[in-house]
Amino acid sequence: MIKSIPSISSEVDEEKIFKIINENFSQLAPAYYTLVTHWLINAYKVHKGIDKFIILIYLINKDFIFYRKNGLIVDYDTFYKDKSLEIPKINISDIAKDLLIPKENVRRKISELEEKGIIKRRGKKIFIERSGFIQSKTNVTLNDFSILVSKFSEVLKDKKITDKSFDTEEISKSIKENFSFCWYQFYKFIFIFTNSWKAGTKTQDLETICVGLIVLINTVQNRNFKNKN
């Protein structure tokens, strides 16, 4: 329950935040690229194909969208409590368009997920088995994500945008409590990120892009790395 009315003047200025990110990206880059690279590697490990996993989380994200539309916040433990997750009707054309994956590839990968028992149909309902998006992989991403947000909170404090910074444990706890909202935002980022790489490099091969990111992360973790902008 809100105990006091929020001040309109306290609204976050997105342009100012983006400017701070751009000007201080060298401080955020190691944590940022670690998050992305670990996610892509783990996505590949689950189904031996990054696109297949992205299609899976695209379907899962439909539930997160449903929660948002209905003003619901589902915490981490509740979300992972059941063995399966009901999802809306699968639309091949929408998936292909939104993820920049050819329709035939989408159709084939969904068929493979059904053959493995990850996607199951029970009458008119469709379910995803939890084994398809292993919880341990989420724990890795949660930790990496928390480190990045914690680092960014330090930057914001240094620039006097906020009064305090938050450690990784505080961030992780908050994400778990607001899991459906936070993971909706994270998945939205993943879709934008992978689509931009596909469009920018004109390749559908996210595995090759992942190799390039590993090289990049070795660069940004170098102590001599500087922001050239």
Model-identified regions with their sequence ranges:
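Short, cationic-aromatic polyanion-contact patches
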Residues: 74-77, 91, 124-148
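N-terminal leader segment of winged-helix/HTH proteins
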Residues: 1-53, 158-202, 206-209, 213
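Short amphipathic alpha-helical interaction segments
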Residues: 100-115
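A short alpha-helical element within helix-turn-helix/winged-helix DNA-binding domains
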Residues: 78-97, 113, 229
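Short helix-capping/hinge SLiMs at alpha-helix to coil transitions
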Residues: 83-86, 217-221
